[in-house]
Swiss-Prot record:
GO molecular function, one term: rRNA binding
Subunit and partners: Part of the 30S ribosomal subunit. Forms a loose heterodimer with protein S19. Forms two bridges to the 50S subunit in the 70S ribosome.
Keywords assigned by UniProt, alphabetized: Ribonucleoprotein, Ribosomal protein, RNA-binding, rRNA-binding
Task of the protein: Located at the top of the head of the 30S subunit, it contacts several helices of the 16S rRNA. In the 70S ribosome it contacts the 23S rRNA (bridge B1a) and protein L5 of the 50S subunit (bridge B1b), connecting the 2 subunits; these bridges are implicated in subunit movement.
Protein name: Small ribosomal subunit protein uS13
NCBIfam families the record matches: PRK04053.1, uS13_arch
HAMAP family named in the record: Ribosomal_uS13
An individual GO BP term: translation
Region (Disordered): 142-162
Organism: Methanosarcina acetivorans (strain ATCC 35395 / DSM 2834 / JCM 12185 / C2A)
Length: 162
């Protein structure tokens, strides 16, 4: 059985006749070309390991192939498979189910995740929901205890008797 470093060395030796692209651009994001496809795709916000493996299989690309050695056609296949990910998987695998505005199931990728998350928190603050108030005050939101933990800032310390 080959360990991870041995496997990478084996893959590099196998493909040494081609030039390794160290950065591969997919969905306006630079991904590491030295990693296997299933791990390199996790560099996209909104794509985890399981999602990346499904995207690679949906595109017809070997998930264990090194991303930097893939030809441009296969990289383009990966790009289109990422766009069609919502159609391939069941709704419970998507990261935005029953969107508040549209009611649709979506899978957000890239900067859309950050913008939507920030928008949701601002909406909670605007309607003065309990969670929104906790976010405003910088306190814990999910019901954790706050008597002794979660204290931030510099420690005061105890003054010594003279």
């Amino acid at each position: 059985m080959l360990y991870a470093l041995q496997w990478r060395k084996y893959m590099v030796e196998e493909n040494n006749n081609e030039e390794l692209r160290h950065l591969v651009r997919i969905m306006n994001t630079d991904l590491q070309g030295a990693k296997p496809v299933q791990y390199a795709l996790t560099g996209l916000p909104g794509v985890g390991r399981r999602t990346a493996k499904l995207i690679a299989k949906g595109a017809g690309v070997d998930p264990s192939a090194i991303l930097g050695y893939l030809p441009e056609e296969e990289v383009a296949k990966l790009d289109t498979a990422i766009g069609k990910f919502e159609d391939i998987v069941p709704s419970w695998m998507l990261n935005r189910q029953k969107d508040l505005a549209t009611g649709q199931d979506k899978h957000l990728l890239g900067t859309d995740i950050l913008l939507t998350f920030r928008e949701d928190i601002n909406n909670l603050k605007k309607v003065r929901a309990y969670r929104g108030l906790r976010h405003e005050r910088g306190l814990k939101v999910r019901g954790q205890r706050t008597k002794s933990t979660g204290r931030r800032g510099s420690t005061v310390g105890v003054s010594r008797k003279k």
